[in-house]
Amino acid sequence: MSVIETSSIETLGIEIPAIPEIDAFLLCVTPQAWVDYALKNLDVVLIDHALCEKKAASTAISLMHRYPQYDELLDKMTALAREELTHFKQVINLLRERGITYQNIAPGRYAGKIFKHLRTSELGHFIDALIIGAIIEARSCERFAALVPGLVTQGEVALAGYYCSLIKAEARHFEGYLYLAELYTDEPIAPRVASLLAIEQQLIQSPDTKFRFHSGVPC
């Protein structure tokens, strides 16, 4: 972040929450090429952001349906689904305010490529799904923070402030998913986390032909 951007953010009273646990968790930061492209294509960013929030709520409900025997999962996923749907409605309102038509757009490769690596055993599949949930929430958190300085520079102060407000929520979801992954297995999850994070890093840093909120380097 440049001195000008830092000064602008402080003057406007916008503070990007520091989430060191996310920085320590992810293996890479968002490439600047993605940030630059996103700032020029905010309509796509917002549409896909809305879709991501809806999908996150759907994933939480799916986990509740598939694993009803886990009380703590039910509690956390109920709260998460409710919050994700609230965020979905907020982004829909932003789209309407901007005159952008909300629509379904084809998903990028990100989630699909990671989920292809789910283990086939029942417990392995379950734990992997929770770990991947944590990874996606962590990346969302990091991307919101990456966008804020450029949004302020472009005069998108309201959107920058909104994205700052989402950072702590996404970090909380990240922590919740990791907590559940550790809770429901007796084996250390660190090796599996490292393996899935390496896949995520490759997707974030490699060229990507379809620009989306979680896509790789635009090409």
Regions found by a protein language model. Name each.
Residues 2-219:
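Non-heme di-metal
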